[in-house]
Amino acid sequence: LFLCITGRLWNYVELKGLNRDLWQQMLRFSLPMIPAQISFWVINASDLFFVREMCGGLDGHSGDAWSGLLSTGYFLPTILTTLGLIFYDAWQLSAVTEEEGRARFFTKIFRTYSSVLFCCAAGIIWLCRPVMHVMKANYYYAWHFVPFLTLASTCSCFNQFLNSAYVVNKKSTHSLWTMLAGAVSNCIMNYFFIKWWGPIGATVASFFGLGIVFVLRALDAHNMIGMSIHPGRVALNFGVLAGEALLLLAEPPLYGLWTGLLTAAIILFNFAGVWAMARMLLPKLLGRRGRALVSAVDNWIKK
């Protein structure tokens, strides 16, 4: 309503000259997005439903209690999804308007974007225990759900990015089928993983379910626009993050040190991509000081 009033959108509505062909194209493009969004909701909501129904009485807690802890576990991974939403809003216009060298453009932006997300994910997993203790002390046990929910949120951000390939090619039905595949597989995995591993199994199911969507969309993006996600690099990052998550959950001696070292390894491995984004943002945010900082770091790297 606010946008309608401030933008005077009624000036752009012409009821007399209705273009039926354009109307049909818009419907074909937009209608599949509704069940696709519902499928995304199913992936998140099914976790809570399965945990509530299957974990009642586990360790003396009701199903509602476990469901509440799982909801609290989303607290830190929300940082990633918020970052992804901000980026997607800024990126969407460029994705549509950039026509020359689109494959190279998408590949370059994804590499930088994924580098930032991988570093953030590693930091969240490493620090989730102390942060949950300070911020959500009454729900401290919820930290167990954070590691794989963070991995799931990373996949969700990637899926949102790759959805741009469907927008560019007006192939929204592919968005529906990929999300539907993720939703169905997530429900199936929820049932088995929760039986095997308890409520933490729901977070693993979310990671694998959204991971399936990511793989399908990466293949589509490659076929549609020639984009490459550099699968070896992405698999290595996810492998290290999964290892960090498992280490944190297993709690071996000095687990904080080992997870910290893995976080440092992720940051070093992705530093080039992170610095590429920082080089663009720092001058805009800090002005002259930002340019001086960029110059100093560039000189240090060259040495």
Q: What are the functions of these language-model segments?
A:
Residues 96-97, 150-181, 221-227:
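Membrane-interface junctions at transmembrane-helix termini in multi-pass inner-membrane proteins
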Residues 38-79, 129-138, 196:
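Helix-terminus/linker motif at the lipid-water interface of multi-pass membrane proteins
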Residues 73, 77-103, 107-113, 163-168:
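Helix-loop junctions and terminal segments of transmembrane helices
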Residues 58-64, 124-154, 160, 200:
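Interfacial segments at transmembrane-helix termini and the short loops linking adjacent helices
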Residues 1, 60-63, 173, 180-215, ...:
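Membrane-interface helix-loop junctions in multi-pass transport and translocation proteins
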Residues 1-44, 94-104, 224-236, 280-288:
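Interhelical loop/hinge segments that connect adjacent transmembrane helices in multipass membrane
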Residues 32, 49, 66-84, 111-112, ...:
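Alpha-helical transmembrane segments of polytopic membrane transporters and translocases
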Residues 249-303:
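Membrane-proximal transmembrane or re-entrant/amphipathic helices at the cytosolic face
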